[in-house]
């Protein structure tokens, strides 16, 4: 029976089940005869929400799944598509294991579990471009998100007598739709120009309303989402008899030199490799998602700083006007004068 995976990717579950059994039998992947029954150890309706006993033997532990969902921004349901022996030099596009609709990509996530060498095991991922990643697998549960646009191979040390490879698909949030005005709920979406073209010395931008919550930044090369640590509002300096939450400016245009944009903007990461945006040494936001097409572009790239600087400098005119209030969400009131 052919079923649709997240309304994008079609696959034949029965075909994958047959290959799952055949691969293990022909290659002595798992020698115990009881593993030859797919009905017993692999449910035909495996989903993240269908936690029958038969599924768990071929699925991941809930904590690892939760970590992957949280860190990789995986959409709703994950289905176990294939569990088989190691596949060498797997071309995901040629094998039709990658589906791309617009900017939405189903990324394959490869989980390596139940290795015989356990904490002595090292997993090597090598792409055709020569990029090699080795990671010590101390917990015998290992997850790798593969770039679907390059071929790769997986290898294990010779000491490993058996292992289990689970390949599933997830949809990363790469399909942010550019808009000119803030989304409902004071969400600003900023569309960045093509970075392959020469950026002029000045950028003319338009902003409406206030920013409170999330900032989406899009370009032809990267997309990132920031979760603000502080709420920012554009409010008049006079009169001061209304709170910042009740006052908003709209349709304000401003022309800002690029040098001024990135002057006080810095991006840093902590020991846990979590990226933060700082403005004049004050933490403004945290990166909740970053995706790029060009591998040369990272969170610290100059173009990313320019895009973030536009957001900050439009909201804040004078660094001394930032007032911190000791709230649990670290509320900060950012003042901007009328005649900027």
Swiss-Prot record:
Q: What Pfam families does the annotation carry?
A: DUF1231
InterPro entries membership: Vaccinia_virus_B17
Superkingdom to which the source organism belongs: Viruses
Instruction: Give the family per the record.
Output: Belongs to the orthopoxvirus B17 protein family.
Protein name per Swiss-Prot or TrEMBL: Protein B17
Give the species.
Answer: Vaccinia virus (strain Copenhagen)
